[in-house]
């Protein structure tokens, strides 16, 4: 049986413990040996990042240097076009072949807006979705047809993620950390401490570069 590959996308502006810690817990829960982080270049659903792509890449490298679970994929950073998950997953599927189990990790907030994503209906053709639960967010989709879509693909058996190449949605019971990149940027702008929110090498780099001031 081929091992489950997992991808984790985002802006990471900057990367912080709210990104890394839930995914590390998830890896232990469902048996992931490698998670590939894919930073966006031009995110289609949010404003352009404050740190440029080179700076965000370097912060990620610093954050995962002592974490063998994680590896970095730069393909979206090398595009000048918007970073569409559907496109990236199609590329991965073509590279890995039809039989390798592949999953894309998202937060519960992203699940609720998932039907607005570019070619969202093709994503489950190429990968599973693993959703990190977040308190305060409902499990119901906004419209009945999307709720039906969720229920049609939902599984409560994590083994399905390993045995099938794509097509399932799994809601993972991961810890939630009240940390966001927005909070970190605001604290830095106000001269407040962020030592408990992100890895020390990342904070050192932010200060050296004068980011988010």
Swiss-Prot record:
Q: Which domain of life is it from?
A: Bacteria
GO terms, biological process: NAD biosynthetic process
Catalysed reaction, written as an equation: nicotinate beta-D-ribonucleotide + ATP + H(+) = deamido-NAD(+) + diphosphate
Which terms does the record give in the GO molecular function aspect?
ATP binding; nicotinate-nucleotide adenylyltransferase activity
E.C. designation(s): 2.7.7.18
**InterPro entries given in the database record:** Cyt_trans-like, NadD/NMNAT, Rossmann-like_a/b/a_fold
Q: Key word Nucleotidyltransferase present in the record?
A: yes
Q: Which UniProt keywords apply?
A: ATP-binding, NAD, Nucleotide-binding, Nucleotidyltransferase, Pyridine nucleotide biosynthesis, Transferase
Checking Pfam families in the record gives:
CTP_transf_like
The pathway where this protein functions is:
Cofactor biosynthesis; NAD(+) biosynthesis; deamido-NAD(+) from nicotinate D-ribonucleotide: step 1/1
Gene3D superfamilies documented for this protein: HUPs (3.40.50.620)
Q: What class of enzyme is it?
A: transferase
Q: What function does the entry list?
A: Catalyzes the reversible adenylation of nicotinate mononucleotide (NaMN) to nicotinic acid adenine dinucleotide (NaAD).
PANTHER family recorded for this chain? Answer: NICOTINATE-NUCLEOTIDE ADENYLYLTRANSFERASE-RELATED (PTHR39321), PHOSPHOPANTETHEINE ADENYLYLTRANSFERASE (PTHR39321:SF3)
The record's similarity note reads: Belongs to the NadD family.
Q: What is this protein called?
A: Probable nicotinate-nucleotide adenylyltransferase
Q: What is the scientific name of the source organism?
A: Shigella boydii serotype 18 (strain CDC 3083-94 / BS512)
């Amino acid at each position: 049986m081929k091992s489950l590959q997992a991808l984790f996308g985002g802006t990471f502006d900057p990367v912080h413990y709210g990104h890394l810690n839930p995914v590390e817990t998830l890896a232990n829960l469902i048996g992931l040996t490698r998670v590939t982080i894919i930073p966006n270049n031009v995110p289609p659903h949010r404003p352009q990042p404050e740190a440029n792509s080179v700076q965000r890449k370097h912060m990620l490298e610093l954050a995962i240097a002592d974490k063998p679970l994680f590896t970095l994929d730069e393909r979206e950073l090398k595009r000048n076009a918007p970073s569409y998950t559907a496109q990236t997953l199609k590329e991965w599927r073509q590279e890995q072949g039809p039989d390798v189990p592949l999953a894309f990790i998202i937060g519960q907030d992203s699940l609720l807006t998932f039907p607005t994503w570019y070619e969202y209906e093709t994503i489950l053709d190429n990968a599973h979705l693993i959703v990190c639960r977040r308190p305060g967010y409902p499990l119901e989709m906004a419209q009945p047809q999307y709720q039906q879509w969720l229920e049609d693909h939902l599984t409560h058996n994590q083994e399905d993620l390993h045995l099938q190449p794509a097509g399932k949605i799994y809601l993972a019971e991961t810890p939630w950390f009240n940390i966001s990149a927005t909070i970190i940027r605001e604290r830095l702008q106000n001269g407040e401490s962020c030592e408990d929110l992100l890895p020390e090498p990342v904070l050192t780099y932010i200060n050296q570069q004068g980011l988010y001031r």
